Design a protein with these regions (language model features):
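Bacterial Sec-dependent N-terminal signal peptides
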Residues: 1-32
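Periplasmic c-type cytochrome electron-transfer domains
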Residues: 25-358
């Protein structure tokens, strides 16, 4: 009898230990679930747009917390060596994430080589930068971070700063199972935020989607002229064909550094070729050209009308047209009226920085 009771006590004790252990495990598991809660975001593709770039989505799908980390990093001056500028210093939302300087201005008022390109619809593109130096968006932030004329820092220095900040520590614990802050993840999160910067709500877009909006007579004339004389390079709906062309714009005085795509490829055939920029939100992204050669759209169109600089590798389309795109005074006015329909006021006014609670 005594042996039987002793067995019951032992078994009961084992049962309670098991219950406590199981309960503890469940609590730990629940805590982990609460800590790591980072669903993949479903980006809405505008109906009049092409498919997203599959490589970017496959290798770095945007997540709820990843995007928030990227947004915080984008506005964080710690990415620069002396903590004085952030990505947002040059990429300002009200200018379609560009700025109004001819060339980018970095720390200590250093002047960069090129005009700041706007950040919009990056998820639809397959290469980045004026010269196509980057094919994976998560590698793009490395260039401004390490460039002497821009942030003049290093990835390791940025990592050191970010790893010390309590808000980032909490956010990374929510974003990744192990909570580790790494340089790779910093770059991935920046790219995820940039993926969400989709501009597709201009007057033009609403017309293309049959949303009970129509062009004015002047805008309609401009659209027809645009289709005849501009759409060869600035293809709808992104208003770029993502090609690189030498269109005979005035050259950057810094001829030692500036070679266009040839700076990357080393090929003479690529001299002074640059990415065909998107014309979306063009109304708010002056000045124009690879180093801000033109202060207004009128200047750009007048230059194309008068005749561009001749080069051995000038784009064949321009050569066929006698090195110019002829436009009358009225045509220029109509084209500019149309280009203003590409302004997405919802996009350029969306400048709030809201970080999720940690």
């Amino acid at each position: 009898m005594h042996f039987y009771l002793q067995n019951i006590k032992i078994n009961t004790l084992k049962f309670f230990i098991f219950v406590l252990f199981f309960s503890s495990c469940k609590k730990e598991e629940a805590a982990k679930i609460e800590l790591f809660n980072n669903p993949v975001l479903s980006l809405d593709k505008p109906s009049n747009f092409p498919e997203f770039d599959s490589y970017n989505l496959r290798t770095n799908a945007p997540t709820l917390v990843g995007v928030e980390i990227g947004k915080k990093l984008f506005f964080d001056k710690q990415l620069s060596r002396d903590n004085t500028i952030s990505c947002n210093s040059c990429h300002i939302s009200s200018y379609a994430y560009g700025d109004h300087n001819s060339q980018a201005i970095g720390i200590q008022a250093r002047v960069g080589l090129r005009n700041t390109p706007p950040i919009q619809n990056m998820i639809f593109l397959n290469t980045y930068m004026w010269d196509g130096a980057v094919i994976d968006l998560k590698d793009q932030p490395i260039i401004p971070i390490i460039t002497h004329e821009e942030m003049d820092s290093s990835i390791s220095e940025v990592l050191r700063k970010i790893q010390k900040e309590d808000t980032y520590i909490k956010l990374f614990k929510r974003a990744y199972p192990d909570g580790e802050i790494t340089s790779k993840r910093i770059l991935e999160c920046l790219a995820q935020f940039m993926f969400t910067l989709i501009s597709a709500n201009s007057k033009y877009d609403k017309i293309m989607r049959n949303e009970d909006v129509s062009f004015s007579a002047e805008e309609q004339k401009g659209y027809l002229i645009f289709q005849q004389k501009c759409a060869f390079c600035h293809k709808e709906p992104l208003f770029t064909d993502q090609s690189f062309r030498n269109i005979g714009f005035p050259k950057n005085p810094n001829k030692i550094e500036e070679k266009g795509v040839a700076r990357v490829s080393g090929e003479k055939a690529d001299l002074y070729k640059f990415r065909v920029p998107t014309l979306r939100n063009i109304e708010v992204t002056a000045p124009y050209g690879d180093h801000g050669q033109f202060t207004s759209l009128e200047e750009v169109l007048s230059y194309l009308d008068q005749g561009v600089e001749n080069d051995t590798n000038l784009d064949p389309y321009l050569k066929e047209k006698g090195n110019r795109i002829p436009l009358s005074k009225e045509e220029k006015k109509y084209v500019i009226s149309f280009l203003k329909t590409l302004t997405d006021y919802t996009f350029i006014k969306n400048n709030e920085l809201k970080i999720i609670k940690t």
